[in-house]
Amino acid sequence: MGQHILAIDQGTTSSRSIIFSPKRSIDAIAQQEFSQKYPKDGWVEHDPEEIWESVVSTLKEVFNKCSVAPSDIAAIGITNQRETTLVWDKHSGKPVYNAIVWQDRRTAQYCRDFSEDEAFVSYITEATGLLLDPYFSATKIAWILDNVEGAREKAENGDLLFGTVDSYLIWRLTGGESHKTDATNASRTMLFDIHNQCWDEKLLSKFNIPASMLPEVMDCAADFGVIKEEIIGRAIPIQGVAGDQQAALVGQACFEKGMAKSTYGTGCFMILNTGDAPLQSKNRLLTTVGYRLNGKTTYALEGSIFMAGATVQWLRDGLKLIDDAAESEALAQRAREDNGVFLVPAFTGLGAPYWDPDARGAILGLTRDTGISEIVAAGLQSVCYQTKDLQKAMESDGARPTTIRVDGGMSRNDWVMGFLSDILGAEVERPEITETTALGAAFLAGLQAGVFNSIDDLTHCWKSDSVFTPRLTKQERDQAYDGWKSAVARIRCS
């Protein structure tokens, strides 16, 4: 058996396949973007067939980029955009509707209707660790069943299946032989009891979702099925699965209570390991499954920010202030210090800890001296300020991060990471391999395949590239953060 591991990283805007060597270095990466669909204001969809084709394309391409052969692969790991919802016919395999993406807000009215039952809203949080919000899968499934002709009847007859993206890919890769998910993805559906690690019958009944639609929930390192030989020329077991942010937690080797990782992709997601007991947040953070290995659940506290890299995309595509993301660092370095400009990127509302879907973005503090550099810098700083919001909320919940590790595309921007350390007042560690989401999936698959013996092996694989230390005084840090809080207060709607 080979010792290489193949990771499938199915994200919000693209799919990637990455081959990791036995030494945990990257042998090859293949990536393919796919289209985003916005049929109505606040709606975001993906074509399931485009997702599938992009995954298969990268699986084939990645082997053309290196000397590794499919026979060298010990196992496959899958990580994916979470909450995104698919429903398909279990006989034909055809989706009954496009994938409804995690960013989609069409079920806001569903949530408003359910919110009138305060006892039920409290039950959701107690059972799932989540807040009632369109972000999660439950109301997306309900919308599909209520709005796609014939879907409700088919579901009640046991003819439809639900899955987050991981589950859909497992189904397709195994030729329909395996309908499974892992505990991290299940924990993001708003249908999963994170304490008893099972689907919650009360929630299924309230949301009117047949239990027959749901996948079997597995550990993150487990046997999920074997991909069909015709896909890449060899039948290879799928042995590791985790939602993208939990996969990054594993890839960052945050296995000790108090360790946190913050991933900067389209959005920003900060997850703190809270150990073997779930910590219920009083500050609107999410209690979730960090990972589950050998039947033992490690819990986490999570804060979700909707706009991180997406803010840079808006500076580029919307305002046309930059030609590419790399240019933003040079411009920010030229910005006047203490310029008083704040950009609040509430383009689709505010995430944690505010959860204000009606808030809208603004640039505040503009003067005649304000130029492109100051606006770009404010956009980059907004990501750091929002991370500070999460840090403060975690500390208020009694869970102060002891270690903060960063990854994702924006983590390669030294200016941003320097300011992040400044505003957090803490050291920020960046690893040698910033592809930690895919690495986490590879780690999990490697554990099940026997490439790794234990999580101690994974801890020793993690290597630091850079450590950023705070330069601001406490007074300077507090003054800057007070300015941010004032800016947010001015655009809040709830």
Curated annotation (Swiss-Prot):
UniProt key word Nucleotidyltransferase: no
N-terminal signal peptide: none
E.C. number: 2.7.1.30
Database matches in Pfam families: FGGY_C, FGGY_N
InterPro entries: ATPase_NBD (IPR043129), Carb_kinase_FGGY (IPR000577), Carb_kinase_FGGY_CS (IPR018483), FGGY_C (IPR018485), FGGY_N (IPR018484), Glycerol_kin (IPR005999)
Residues that bind ADP: 12, 16, 266, 309, 409, 413
Binding site for ATP: 12-14, 266, 309, 313, 409
SUPFAM superfamilies: Actin-like ATPase domain (SSF53067)
Chain's role: Key enzyme in the regulation of glycerol uptake and metabolism. Catalyzes the phosphorylation of glycerol to yield sn-glycerol 3-phosphate.
Protein name in the entry: Glycerol kinase
Organism this protein belongs to: Alteromonas mediterranea (strain DSM 17117 / CIP 110805 / LMG 28347 / Deep ecotype)
Taxonomic lineage of the native organism: Bacteria, Pseudomonadati, Pseudomonadota, Gammaproteobacteria, Alteromonadales
